[in-house]
């Protein structure tokens, strides 16, 4: 079952208003715009893990909860497009600011009230994990929610209210010398969502993990 706008209309989620922010619709983005420095500059999202391209694994998990999924990538865009997703690059104005560059591009592109993001190098993530984020966001739609487990925070598995997050993020990037995802979240207002299946949060960002 998809937990986007159609699911809300069907009664699976009830639009919840807190202040002026309402959870109405959802898109998903695979973050694949990194430089892959710990992978000898390979494009991580296009590497195989257990026989499947990692960005595809993440994209298919996102498609379990929303039909509107795209990929943020700054190279090999045609190869990413061959996976069956629309591909967007970072805005040149916000380049070289780490994962926040990708977040800015995705928030700018999204046409929904909320955006789910997930990094390309966590190919074991499930739609169930995203569903838990969605329900947290439906209860408090004006906050950023991100996954955490017993080992710490996973801020790039997150759901964000698109319009207000983009406004605050641009201001944050213009004024701050810290390009920390958590620092931005704390400025905006955030909550962690516990996910107890730590194996799904495996970060495949070094050759030894890939093998």
Language-model segments: which ranges?
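Nucleotide and nucleotide-moiety/phosphate-recognizing core
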Residues: 22-178, 186-200, 208
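Acidic two-metal-ion nuclease catalytic site recognized across multiple nuclease folds
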Residues: 211
